[in-house]
């Protein structure tokens, strides 16, 4: 679970302008952080299938947002996956 401060830090790092909180970049960065934390949880709790299902939903949502960004602006897409260290 992300704290309010951690969430604000991620938003500040990826926002496009001062009041930006919902751009695809910000949403993808927040999802990536949640996915990484859930991955760590699942390394320890291997039989937590409910959380695994949530993880798969989040990965699917992130993939949809990445596909949207790729169609909308390929340069922003490439820059974001470079920053986040994602494949593809």
Curated annotation (Swiss-Prot):
GO function terms (MF aspect): rRNA binding; structural constituent of ribosome
Function: One of the primary rRNA binding proteins, it binds directly to 16S rRNA where it helps nucleate assembly of the platform of the 30S subunit by binding and bridging several RNA helices of the 16S rRNA. Forms an intersubunit bridge (bridge B4) with the 23S rRNA of the 50S subunit in the ribosome.
Assembly: Part of the 30S ribosomal subunit. Forms a bridge to the 50S subunit in the 70S ribosome, contacting the 23S rRNA.
InterPro entries, sorted: Ribosomal_uS15, Ribosomal_uS15_bac-type, uS15_NS1_RNA-bd_sf
PROSITE patterns: RIBOSOMAL_S15
This protein's record includes keyword RNA-binding: yes
One Pfam family hit: Ribosomal_S15
Signal sequence residues: none
Annotated keywords: Ribonucleoprotein, Ribosomal protein, RNA-binding, rRNA-binding
Transmembrane segments: none
Protein source organism: Caldicellulosiruptor saccharolyticus (strain ATCC 43494 / DSM 8903 / Tp8T 6331)
UniProt keyword annotation of rRNA-binding present: yes
GO biological process terms, semicolon-separated: translation
Family indicated by similarity: Belongs to the universal ribosomal protein uS15 family.
One term under GO cellular component: cytosolic small ribosomal subunit
PANTHER family: RIBOSOMAL PROTEIN S15, BACTERIAL AND ORGANELLAR (PTHR23321), SMALL RIBOSOMAL SUBUNIT PROTEIN US15M (PTHR23321:SF26)
Protein name: Small ribosomal subunit protein uS15
């Amino acid at each position: 679970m992300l704290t309010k401060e951690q969430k604000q830090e991620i938003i500040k790092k990826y926002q496009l302008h001062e009041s930006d909180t919902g751009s695809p970049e910000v949403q993808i960065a927040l999802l990536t952080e949640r996915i990484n934390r859930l991955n760590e949880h699942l390394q320890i709790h291997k039989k937590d299938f409910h959380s695994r299902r949530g993880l798969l939903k989040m990965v699917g949502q992130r993939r949809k947002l990445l596909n949207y960004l790729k169609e909308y602006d390929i340069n922003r897409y490439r820059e974001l996956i470079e920053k986040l260290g994602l494949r593809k």
